[in-house]
């Protein structure tokens, strides 16, 4: 099988040297992502496209899906590459390929040609289109807005029969821009802002301020791992967790109620800036949107920025919440975000929307900054690829099984869309559907006399959720890995 990767248009207008660098980086990213599917896969770069050739037909859908999620790709063409002799040979091959698709449809033929030939692209379009129209009685030519467009590419003595076109996510290849550190909470905003910077070519590391204990961190790890695995797995990134409970405690004890929100954000920026400097990261990324909450007014954002020289990027600054939620739905983080607790919102009952710098600084004089220094010094920094391995160690008391007992039930915790696309059926055992984002509220309603075997395709989510349920006191859970 063969795929032709078309570049994001902004790449094609770069200077020659920059364009070549971008294409080289994108080629490497594609190799890094796809090597998990087929080690014999070949990735070949050209001036205006990249070819991907693979032998394992069983991995075709997985490879195609992975390509649509790699930043820098505008669209993917799935093609059949065959030799040809003349225009009539092109027609005959097109007839075999497209006959079934054109039955009862209106169509047109579009041809791109490279190389030396005794015919033009329009000649091929007319010849093939006329032939298809004659040989498929129920088909009809329509040059504007046809139901089916037959795409052909002729290159020297090769014919590319385009079997399908699939849109990519566009943007720049990861690694073409510098690294950033995303302040991730697991909510709608931070997940979307992280994705937007990945799509713009940045390697995104994650910094999490833990305000809610182990369960909160597990949830945010899931979001970060999902984003990395889905859009950024071509590169290694860090997941940095900072235990911010001592900082919150100090703020609650010593800071005036109205100033708490702004001061908490200032402390977060201070801590994140130190982490960024430690790891050579150039900028911070937040999910703040203008006026969304009290700390996100222009006055307050300026005061928050003042505590650090590190550049702070806010890709969602002009977005409304509905737009952000729609983006979260598109990239797959909506379900995570809906069940993620929001701890920052409860810290202040009457927050100021227009903080005064002198008052903020006066309040911060009461704060013991050694506490902030200590939590930054004790950050937990892990390679995001190790999250699954760490989860295995953390849930060592949760048994992993590949067989069944008489009291066992498989609990499919994938999202509803995934379950509908690939229903799980296992002979001889009941399978119950309960998406992961409903486990925290609905698992207790299940029959607690049964043993529930949590299952997801990769096993990461099932292990994380097993740990969470164990922490909640449910001992009748295991992880199912066939």
UniProtKB/Swiss-Prot annotation:
Pathway: Cofactor biosynthesis; thiamine diphosphate biosynthesis. GO terms for molecular function: ATP binding; CCA tRNA nucleotidyltransferase activity; tRNA binding; tRNA-uracil-4 sulfurtransferase activity. The active site is at residue 456. Residues 404-482 form the Rhodanese domain. PANTHER family: TRNA SULFURTRANSFERASE. Catalyzes the ATP-dependent transfer of a sulfur to tRNA to produce 4-thiouridine in position 8 of tRNAs, which functions as a near-UV photosensor. Also catalyzes the transfer of sulfur to the sulfur carrier protein ThiS, forming ThiS-thiocarboxylate. This is a step in the synthesis of thiazole, in the thiamine biosynthesis pathway. The sulfur is donated as persulfide by IscS. This is tRNA sulfurtransferase. The gene is thiI.
């Amino acid at each position: 099988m063969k795929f032709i990767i078309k570049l994001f248009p902004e790449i094609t207008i770069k200077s020659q040297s920059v364009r070549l660098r971008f294409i080289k980086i994108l080629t490497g990213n594609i190799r890094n992502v796809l090597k998990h599917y087929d080690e014999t896969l070949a990735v070949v770069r050209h001036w205006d496209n990249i070819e991907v050739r693979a032998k394992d037909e069983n991995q075709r859908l997985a490879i195609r899906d992975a390509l649509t999620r790699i930043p820098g790709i505008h669209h993917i063409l799935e093609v059949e590459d065959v030799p040809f002799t003349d225009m009539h040979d092109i027609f005959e091959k097109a007839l075999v390929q497209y006959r079934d698709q054109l039955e009862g449809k209106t169509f047109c033929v579009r041809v791109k040609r490279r190389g030396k030939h005794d015919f033009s692209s329009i000649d091929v379009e007319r010849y093939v289109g006329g032939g298809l129209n004659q040989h498929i009685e129920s088909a009809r030519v329509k040059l504007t807005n046809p139901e089916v467009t037959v795409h052909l590419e002729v290159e020297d003595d090769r014919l590319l029969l385009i079997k399908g076109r699939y849109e990519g996510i566009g943007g720049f290849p990861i690694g073409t821009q510098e690294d950033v550190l995303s302040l991730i909470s697991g909510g709608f905003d931070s997940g979307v802002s992280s994705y937007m910077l990945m799509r713009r070519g940045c390697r995104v590391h994650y910094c999490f301020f833990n305000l809610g204990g182990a369960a909160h961190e597990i949830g945010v790890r899931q979001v970060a791992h999902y984003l990395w695995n889905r859009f950024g797995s071509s590169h290694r990134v860090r997941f940095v967790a900072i235990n911010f409970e001592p900082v919150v405690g100090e703020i609650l004890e010593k800071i005036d109620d109205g100033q708490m929100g702004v001061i908490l954000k200032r402390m977060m920026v201070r801590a994140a800036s130190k982490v960024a400097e430690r790891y050579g990261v150039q900028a911070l990324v937040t999910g703040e949107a203008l006026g969304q909450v009290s700390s996100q007014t222009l006055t307050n954002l300026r005061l928050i920025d003042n505590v650090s020289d590190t550049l702070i990027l806010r890709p969602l600054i002009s977005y409304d919440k509905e737009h952000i939620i729609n983006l979260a739905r598109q990239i797959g983080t909506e379900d995570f975000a809906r069940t993620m607790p929001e701890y920052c919102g409860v810290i202040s009952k009457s927050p100021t929307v227009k903080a005064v710098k002198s008052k903020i600084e006066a309040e911060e004089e009461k704060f013991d900054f050694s506490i902030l220094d200590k939590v930054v010094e004790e950050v937990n920094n892990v390679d995001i690829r190790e999250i699954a391995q760490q989860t295995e160690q953390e849930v060592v008391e949760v048994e992993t099984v590949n067989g069944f007992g008489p009291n066992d039930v498989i609990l499919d915790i994938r999202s509803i869309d995934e379950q509908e696309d690939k229903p799980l059926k296992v002979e001889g055992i009941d399978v119950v559907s309960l998406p992961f984002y409903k486990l925290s509220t609905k698992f207790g309603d299940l029959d607690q006399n049964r043993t529930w075997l949590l299952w997801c395709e990769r096993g990461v989510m099932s292990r994380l959720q097993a740990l969470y349920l164990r922490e909640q006191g449910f001992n009748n859970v295991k992880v199912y890995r066939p």
